[in-house]
Amino acid sequence: MYKKYTIGTVISNKMNKTITVAVKNKAQHLRYKKIITKTNKYYAHDEHNQCYIGDIVKIRPYRPLSKKKRWILIERIIEK
């Protein structure tokens, strides 16, 4: 079973009711054993426009709301 939520950092809030969240994942390279950090960007729905750049937020998957928006904001963990 997969996790019900993901934690990331808000990198953009210029769209109305939409935030862009960067989620970092760390994995070890199979051959060279180096830790690699991969960053995924997700568009998330922010109903009340309450998030600002730099906030740490919790998001979860949701039904498609637009062409690219498939995540919804659960809560702000750390406010900047």
Swiss-Prot record:
Keywords: Chloroplast, Plastid, Ribonucleoprotein, Ribosomal protein, RNA-binding, rRNA-binding
The UniProt record lists the keyword Cell cycle: no
Origin superkingdom: Eukaryota
PANTHER family the UniProt entry points to: 40S RIBOSOMAL PROTEIN S11 FAMILY MEMBER, SMALL RIBOSOMAL SUBUNIT PROTEIN US17M
Compartment(s): Plastid, Chloroplast
Function of the molecule: One of the primary rRNA binding proteins, it binds specifically to the 5'-end of 16S ribosomal RNA.
Subunit field text: Part of the 30S ribosomal subunit.
Gene Ontology CC: one annotated term: cytosolic small ribosomal subunit
Biological processes annotated in GO: translation
InterPro entries per record: NA-bd_OB-fold (IPR012340), Ribosomal_uS17 (IPR000266), Ribosomal_uS17_bact/chlr (IPR019984)
Transmembrane segments: none
Protein name according to UniProt: Small ribosomal subunit protein uS17c
Organism expressing this protein natively: Gracilaria tenuistipitata var. liui
Family to which the UniProt record says this protein belongs: Belongs to the universal ribosomal protein uS17 family.
Principal localisation: plastid
